[in-house]
Amino acid sequence: MSMYNYVKEAWKVPANSYVKELQWSRMQDWRKEPSVIRVERPTRIDRARNLGYKAKQGIVVVRVSVRRGGLRKPRPKHSKKPSTLGINKITMAKSIQRIAEERAAKKYPNLEVLNSYWVGQDGKQKWYEVILVDSCHPSIKSDKSYNWLCKGTHKGRATRGLTSAGKKGRGLMYKGKGAEKVRPSVRANSKKAK
């Protein structure tokens, strides 16, 4: 079994392997860091490489922390009946992973989101590592596995829901029975898909 398979097996159920102690010590530092921070190398090398990461110029890994649970809505200033306030029990139509990708893209506007993966969570927040690519870098333009990102059609792909997490949230991972209303888009079908 290769080294990557050992790492993959350990991360399948972190609570049953050495990953539990690693996460416990790492999260103490992560909580003190800003919500979006660039990291030198991926925490999960097996997952990162599986999603397209290579240790080369023009590719950056960023760790993003996002709150857990439902949407945190501000309380209306003017008085309302409690039943119509609309603060509690409101769930975002986007996944937390998708929010993490969008925040990373906003922090680094010259880079495009390639993919992302989960690295940890506690009671209050989740951490994701986002792989970003500089589409104007010469080493990316000359690499056949990345130069498709240099086309203008992929600009702002995280905010347009074109990443893997974005497509999953839009229901585009499914086809056939039960997926009749997800194409061409959720809004085109009057939001009947959600």
From Swiss-Prot:
This is Large ribosomal subunit protein eL15. One of its GO terms (cellular component) is cytosolic large ribosomal subunit. One of its GO terms (biological process) is cytoplasmic translation. Belongs to the eukaryotic ribosomal protein eL15 family. Gene3D superfamilies: Ribosomal protein l15e. It holds the Pfam family Ribosomal_L15e. Keywords: Ribonucleoprotein, Ribosomal protein.
